[in-house]
Amino acid sequence: VLYSLNDTKKSDAVLKGIQNDIIEQVGESAFNIGFSGGLDSTALAAISADVLKRDKVTLVHVIYGPYTYSKTLENVLTLSEKLRLSLRIINMRQVQEKVLKNGPACNRCTRKVKIAGVRKTIKDKNTLVGTGANLSDSWGDYGMKMLNGIYAPFLDIGKDEIRRFLTHYSIKEEEVKIGESKFREGCKAKHLLKLMAVPRYHGHSVCLSNEILLDILSQTGIKPDIANVKIVGPLKKNIALINISPLPQAGITDEIVLRLKKIETVDEVILVDAPLELKVKANPSIFRSATARARLEAGPLGRDFADKTSIHWEESPNNKLHTFHVVDCRKKQEA
């Protein structure tokens, strides 16, 4: 990536400000960084390794069992070694499954699973928890860099600036990517757009289908902007929606469809090559809020799909559903 001289000078000034802020806020305290191995947490780890005593910095990777991409763990191990920082791995699979039992809930998962997992490693009350949360995250809504012992030094900056930090520390963007998305990556569980009522059925389908998808694309050398398998449908039927953008040649997509059809917990496979209509049941607190519905339409029900989506909302009488559930879908051309 090429930047102008003015961009470089501005970036250097921003980086210097972040470095000074970390030195001032952390000081001699222990600093445990929630480390996903992604863009944001890697940039924070690199800066911290540069300006703090290394023995005061610990990278904490919260693993979700099979819901963690294998490439994620590979990146975490490689980067922690490259940065020469100690690494702790905390397994929070069962907690995550419990959180998602009542429907998709990424923000709640961040609080109850990811941050809670990092907090488990704290032995000294003066230890700070570091997060790479920035302007692109909902965390930014709080507008506070320091909140309840959690420190977010990137809160006022965006992704472009953070990418420049990586360049400054000679870390290539490929080192922090897993191939799921050019934009925002995470765990496999976020692609389950229904209640995780039975992990061995609902969880198994989203784990295996997404791992197979990335494995096939990796073998072919394809690096799409979006690559995921969303699992939707009623509780007793798992419908796998294959999202790849741009769409590769038919031979590759045919192989992906064939492989996914062999998964025992996948009941139907659909390649998203046209706009989709999604039938979504929602908790009353979401259904009755235009703002909440709009956020979901722009986020998990719109972002990371290979084509446009239109949503038909219904209020759910199921008191076990705390968020939303995509109960059905069809391609618009079939309407």
Model-derived features: positions:
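Short, aliphatic-rich beta-strand segments
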Residues: 59, 233-246
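Generic alpha-helical secondary structure
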Residues: 111, 206-213, 249-257
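ATP-dependent adenylation/nucleotidyltransferase module used to activate substrates
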Residues: 1-168, 240, 257-266, 278-335
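Mid-to-C-terminal catalytic subdomains of enzymes
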Residues: 163-228, 269-283, 289-302
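Generic beta-strand/beta-sheet core signal
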Residues: 132, 243-245, 272-274
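Short, non-transmembrane amphipathic alpha-helical segments
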Residues: 244-270
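Intrinsic-disorder/low-complexity, polar/charged segments
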Residues: 7-9, 38, 205-211, 242, ...
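Short, flexible, solvent-exposed loop/turn segments with mixed acidic/basic and small polar residues
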Residues: 142, 228-234
